[in-house]
A protein has these predicted regions:
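Donor-binding and catalytic core of enzymes assembling or modifying cell-surface/extracellular glycoconjugates
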Residues: 2-91
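Nucleotide-sugar donor-binding patch of glycosyltransferase catalytic domains
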Residues: 35, 45-49, 80-147
């Protein structure tokens, strides 16, 4: 998903939640873009842990969250293990095959496009609408189902 959309969601939720940005070493630049947007929006209650945690530390951090917003990822499944309310954003991947298992507090946000799921990291149609069309308000609407 796009850093500006993650940042918009985080900024909106920062009045109720402390924000934690997770990511692997390959996602540090994206996390830094999110952090920069949060700073510009005046959000101060956040931590950027991208590229800074071991797997056990990541598990420990996720296990203590009140809410987790993520793409289709390994950490999404960690959150399911701990029954963390999760909003999972799906684009090119197949939510029927890879969404959370056994988490009753899970919401999937996706667009229903003919080209989904293509299972490609790079859009074969060159538009990546499956991710571009998911906007912050879609995710925030899903978060409200937990309240």
């Amino acid at each position: 998903w796009y850093p500006e959309e993650f940042a918009q969601v985080a900024a909106e939720l920062s009045e109720k939640y402390d924000i934690v940005i997770f990511g692997g070493l390959g996602e540090v630049d994206i996390a830094n873009d999110i952090e920069k947007s949060l700073i510009e929006k005046g959000v101060t209650n956040y931590q950027n842990l991208a590229g800074k945690t071991t797997i056990p530390e990541l598990i420990n951090q996720i296990s203590s969250l009140d809410l987790f917003i993520t793409g289709d990822s390994g950490p999404m499944h960690i959150a399911a293990t701990f029954q963390i309310p999760t909003v999972a954003i799906f684009g090119p991947t197949n939510h029927d095959e890879t969404s959370q298992w056994m988490n009753e507090k899970s919401m999937i946000v996706k667009k229903n496009l003919e080209c989904q799921p293509c299972m490609k990291r790079t859009c074969p149609l060159k538009h990546h609408n499956c991710m571009k069309m998911v906007v912050a308000s879609d995710v925030l609407r899903a978060v409200k189902t937990f309240n």
